[in-house]
Amino acid sequence: MANAERIRHVASIIQAYKDKKPVVVLSAMGDTTDHLLDAADAALAGNVDISGVEKLHRDSAAELGIDFSPFEPLMQELKQLLTGISMIKELTKRTRDYLVSFGERLSVRMMAAFLSKEKTPAKFFDAWDLGIVSDSNFMAAELLDEVWKNIPMELNSYASGAAKEIPIVTGFISKDKKGDITTLGRGGSDLTATIIGSAMKADEIQTWKDVDGIMTSDPRLCSAARTVPEVTYEEAQELAMFGAQVLHPRSMVPCLKAGVPVRVKNSYNIQSPGSIIVQKHSGAVPKVCAITAVKGVTLIDITSAGMLGAAGFLAHIFNQFLKWNVSIDVIATSEVSVSLTVNTKADLSGLLEDLRRVAQVQARPGKAIVTVICDATKSADVLSTGLVALAAAKINPQMISQAASKVNISMIVDDAQRDDAVKALHAAYFE
């Protein structure tokens, strides 16, 4: 929600669903998180300034006809925090989490106030008000198992009909057992929504984006891209891992556990049914579900005759990646070689030096992973069709890998060929 206009629009969506007893999870407004981090930088330099955050929310409240006085205590709390940062000249992870939490806390108060003004009773909740507790891994906290029983207990009066106000809940933030505010890392707001929906055994969880659900490919690349009506959790996780803007993979874990479907809808096109994420396809499994791609990876080829018949060689190789904290994306192996991809942003110097002590190693940056999400039982047909299409486009995959899940085939191409590869594959499978 970038501004007052978007608050009005989101409020209209909430009002359209009020008979279904929704629980609403919100992120911070617009650029609030950036404003907060800028304010922290200024405080570290000795300047306490909340004007960026205050102006956005004060102006939005005025435009929405909301009294700003209930927001003043939070503004004072923020100012006190920044004053403390300016005095000690330090921003710890714990303090950073406390700082960025103001974005979500202000957002839910704004929405609840506006809905109530518009005769739709609503009540804001900070996540910890619903018993959403985490460990103390600041900036990337994990929720504790007790949230599964806490949430239904705290929302029981609303679920039973005794309480009428629509709950408006902060996404992304939590508290640890000591009462310190934590943030849930990437996909944190989606995770808040899915854990609430799953714990409450909701009919479905809806996540509202700016596209018509999950698309067969990036519509900015493929004008013929269309909405995929239904995907499985497994397919959606693979799509998210390889660049598609769906739910973050970790946010799908609660709904997979509870069996609650997730619908991805477009806040700019509310009439579109979007896409639904389910445990199993309700009908025939499509041969190809979607194509996605991610740029900026490095392809590493590791070759050694010592691999042939040697027990533990791969374990030694992978231990080097663990030692240097480098995550592997895609992998393919043969009797004497391993090819794999890693994020180019990772510092590879120490890793490559260690690997070269036991094998011949070639690192090739500037690569892209193009992934086809498909039906495992038709992988031969999918692969042959795809390779013919790429050959016609004069694109030669430098590595091919099929995931253990059997729902994706990944091909490595040059960064410069990524867009053409996606277009060629989309034309072959969907057009």
Predicted regions and their residues:
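Surface-exposed amphipathic alpha-helical tracts and adjacent flexible/coil segments at the periphery
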Residues: L247-P249, A258, Y268-S275, L348
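A conserved regulatory-domain signal marking ACT and ACT-like small-molecule sensing domains
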Residues: Q271-E431
